[in-house]
């Protein structure tokens, strides 16, 4: 199965490169621009596409001012400028807000390990992770702070939040998929980032399976962490 996945990934990347090469000479249409935006995001966030960045730049160079000012044009520029936050780097001290409008900075939570949980209300695995995250928070309050950050728009975030009772920080950066989640290079949710008490990125992971987050946190936090899935 792993070998088939690798083959599929390789073929998808090759198709991307060939399409971008063709796009350099094709007329710029709305569909062309939408496709360029999708590929720009892939190049920014997935290692297998990184080599095609020069092709994205060449295609972007063909855009006139109205095209660059379109939503897709702005998206391409955003992803071309995006610098991915890697493990070992300091996490940016971004501003977030809660459902009641209270403003926070990530630095407000320093002093304990910080688990960032990127989620969406339409994501099944995100919802499935809630019971385990709740246990983790209850058992490890002394050493760990959990901060959930939505990838939804504010209206959807509030709607979904009304259906769940979070016992931890449930926040929004107001930027959806172009917010902090993009800067970590994630292209799906749930996605998790563990920060040191000083705010350094210790580890990143994407996806959820029962017990995986519990095991992962113990691996990095060590003896001060209490497992909740035996």
Where are these regions (language model features)?
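Generic structural signal for well-ordered beta-strand positions
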Residues: 104-105, 202
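Thiol/disulfide oxidoreductase modules built on the thioredoxin-like
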Residues: 166, 173-221
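Alpha/beta-hydrolase fold active-site loops
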Residues: 113-114, 190
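Oxidative protein folding and maturation machinery
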Residues: 1-104
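Sec-dependent signal peptide cleavage junction
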Residues: 221-230
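Conserved redox-active cysteine motifs that mediate thiol-disulfide chemistry
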Residues: 110-111, 118-138
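Active-site acidic short loop of glycosyltransferases
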Residues: 28-29, 110-112, 186
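Conserved segment of the thioredoxin-like fold in thiol-based oxidoreductases
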Residues: 136-177, 182, 186-189
